[in-house]
Amino acid sequence: MSKRWALPLLLGIFLLAYLLPLGSHGLWIPDETRYAQISQEMLLSGNWVSPHFMNLRYFEKPAAGYWMIAIGQAVFGQNLFGVRFASALSTGLSVLLCFLIARRLWNEPRKSFVCALLYMSFVIVAGQAGYANLDPQFTFWVNLSLVALWFALDSRANGQRLAGWAVLGLACGMGFMTKGFLAWLLPVLIALPWMLWQKRWKELLLYGPVAIAVAIIVSLPWALAVHGQEPDYWRFFFWHEHIRRFAGDDAQHDAPWWFYLPLLVAFSLPWVGMLPVAFKQAWQTRRETGIAFLGLWLLMPLLFFSLSNGKLPTYILPCLLPLALLLGHALADRLRLEQGRALGLNGLLNLLLGLVTLIGLVYVQLKRPLYDHELHSLVLVFIALTGWIISNLLQAFRPLQCWAAPAVGSLLLIALLPAALPRSVVANKMPDQFVLAHQKELTATTHLLSNDLGAASALSWRVKRPQVALYNTIGELKYGLAYPDGIQQRVDPDQVQQWMREARKTGSVGVVMRVKGQDELDELDRLPKDGVRYEQGNLVIMILPQEAS
């Protein structure tokens, strides 16, 4: 692989595998509809300081991540592509960082390309590139901070060191405004032990304040602005989103300490078979400064999140770039030495996984069909699985010539699978598609009501109206609903009939209900029976006309 073609080829893969599929499927609940609506509300209201979710205060995250999604909607339109563009761009920039740091570490064009290709073909990374949430953005800022740190440490000229530390501060500041204080902590977890081990603590004391100053300069204007607009923001954000989430006895998403170990293996698909070789080589060369840095980058965040009480799978996304570098380093060396055994085993492992999945799908489809007269979706699934199987068959039997084949299978799978989901999944997990089918009628109504936050946010985003009355549902909007100007948006079951009478005096009402059991059936039964009604999966849309006065 020549220097000339590496980046254009990666760009082409980015366009085909990351950007092209962005508009092929609806918004997943709860994350995608939430982030789409919050960022859209910034555009509609002009309030870019304090995040609001369906017109209610929502202080679980800072503002910068919403800014990026809002900019995507402003540039490309308030559509699926616009909502997801920030995630795709952030992931693409992380791929570029992987290429650049690999080139700095080893100065081998093919190795740089291999590392970047492995990173962008990780199933979880490619999946996140087409998923509208804050994790791809936060991962990019963490990646940028640590790549900048390595460039600073590896530079001999004072000007280059200063620039590296300044970029580190910029990344920490933006990461902080995207997801919070972890953006400051994670680089420290790597930089401090590495600098002490290398006996370069004087350099840390000299240049560290530069990074701190830049981070403060970047984040302080917004931090002061949000405090001036919402004095309770920092109390809620610090204690609820940091202390309770990671250290509290009632921490969210509690899981055992080993939770991330199998996840790290799964996240390395389709390159799991290369892990033993990569880890063995990393251990043998652990005294090399670059390998030691990558080892700290991989292990320290993994250790921190493993010891915290609250755990979510996406917390360890910042660990994947150093993992890709270690894997790519080992894979490129195997190619140079013409040692294809590990690559062949990797292809064989993926081949077996694909065959088992295909056989399982055929069995389920014959016994209890997932797809009900959905030939188009079923064909897409079989194309995706067949692509995975063929690509890994090639690597299994021609490992040195077809070493990159699993990347093709992985990217094809992630590109096609969301568009190939059964109608039952789309109806229940992507309510914006049902709303889209009746968007004209819902947009024409005066008032909106929903008993489900995911459906409500999908409705709000599709009709471009933040004000949705929440019928017997609170969830993550508990904080916002507690404010005097928010409580009026809440409608309890014993109030809904009175609310409906008052609303229909001034205009028509659009209702989106999720009906999963008897409780929701009772909620539905309290609503008027006239008007137009549509059903799909467990969703019900009602258009209730204005009552004559």
UniProtKB/Swiss-Prot annotation:
Main location: membrane
Pfam families for this protein: PMT
Pathway assigned to this chain's UniProt record: Lipopolysaccharide metabolism; 4-amino-4-deoxy-beta-L-arabinose-lipid A biosynthesis
Domain of life, source organism: Bacteria
Residues that span the membrane, as ranges: 9-29, 80-102, 112-132, 133-153, 176-196, 204-224, 259-279, 290-310, 312-332, 342-362, 377-397, 402-422
Entry-linked InterPro entries: ArnT_tfrase, Glyco_trans_39/83, LipidA_mod_glycosyltrf_83
Reactions this protein catalyses: 4-amino-4-deoxy-alpha-L-arabinopyranosyl di-trans,octa-cis-undecaprenyl phosphate + lipid IVA = lipid IIA + di-trans,octa-cis-undecaprenyl phosphate
GO biological process, one term: lipid A biosynthetic process
GO cellular component, one term: plasma membrane
Localisation: Cell inner membrane
Assigned keywords, A-Z: Cell inner membrane, Cell membrane, Glycosyltransferase, Lipid A biosynthesis, Lipid biosynthesis, Lipid metabolism, Lipopolysaccharide biosynthesis, Membrane, Transferase, Transmembrane, Transmembrane helix
Intrachain disulfide bonds: none
Keyword Transmembrane helix included in the entry's annotation: yes
UniProt EC number: 2.4.2.43
Membrane protein topology class: Multi-pass membrane protein
GO molecular function: 4-amino-4-deoxy-L-arabinose transferase activity; mannosyltransferase activity
Stated role: Catalyzes the transfer of the L-Ara4N moiety of the glycolipid undecaprenyl phosphate-alpha-L-Ara4N to lipid A. The modified arabinose is attached to lipid A and is required for resistance to polymyxin and cationic antimicrobial peptides.
Stored NCBIfam families: PRK13279.1 (NF009784)
Name used for this protein in its record: Undecaprenyl phosphate-alpha-4-amino-4-deoxy-L-arabinose arabinosyl transferase 2
Biological source species: Pseudomonas fluorescens (strain Pf0-1)
